Amino acid sequence: MSLFPFLKLCYNTFMDIWTSLGAFAFFESERLSFRPLIFLDRFDLHEIVSNPQNLQFFFPATQTQHETDCLLVHYFMKEPLGVWAIVDKELDKMIGVVCFEKIDVQKRTAELGYFLNASYWGRGLMTEAVTCLSDLALTAMGMERIILIAHLENKASIRVAEKSGFKLVSRFKGADRYTRTMRDYLRFEKEENCE
């Protein structure tokens, strides 16, 4: 059953994918809120991205606050559509990021990427975030398929994909985008008609 049936009608009538990404710049789940990143997130982001444990499958850790500030502005704020800060509603603290990469408007697909402060691991928060965003994208944003690529050794991300309703579709080898080392990857997909 769709979580956002009235929004699907609205999307089909009025919006394209980019407009819907703008319309859903802010949304919530039970424990989390999602919003565009702002410069005031710089310290919470630095807490996350300066710790290599948080990013071992995403990108290299930053060394200084200045590097984090540059990352924040150039990677997350410069083109904000499809990029959300994950905020713990109880603490009003930015604890992670979830984003769409490789948005294909013609095929109505996007690849989902995310990371979470290690202090919040093991609580089901990333599963909640991925489920909420993927369901919203498939029911109200006009997406037909969401893709999630996980490193084979990233067991936590594989569990998030499975618990969020994604189906494993392939295993492949590829070069890590930062280290250029060959790694094994799993490709998961979630489609509009997935239950």
What name fits each language-model region?
Residues V73-A85:
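A short helix-loop-beta-strand connector motif used in the catalytic cores of GNAT acetyltransferases and
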Residues F4-Q56, V83-E195:
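Acyl-donor (CoA/ACP) binding surface of acyl/acetyltransferases
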Residues Q53-H74:
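Conserved GNAT-fold acetyl-CoA-binding loop/helix
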Residues T64-T68, F76-K78, K89, F115-N117:
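Juxtamembrane/interface motifs at transmembrane-helix termini
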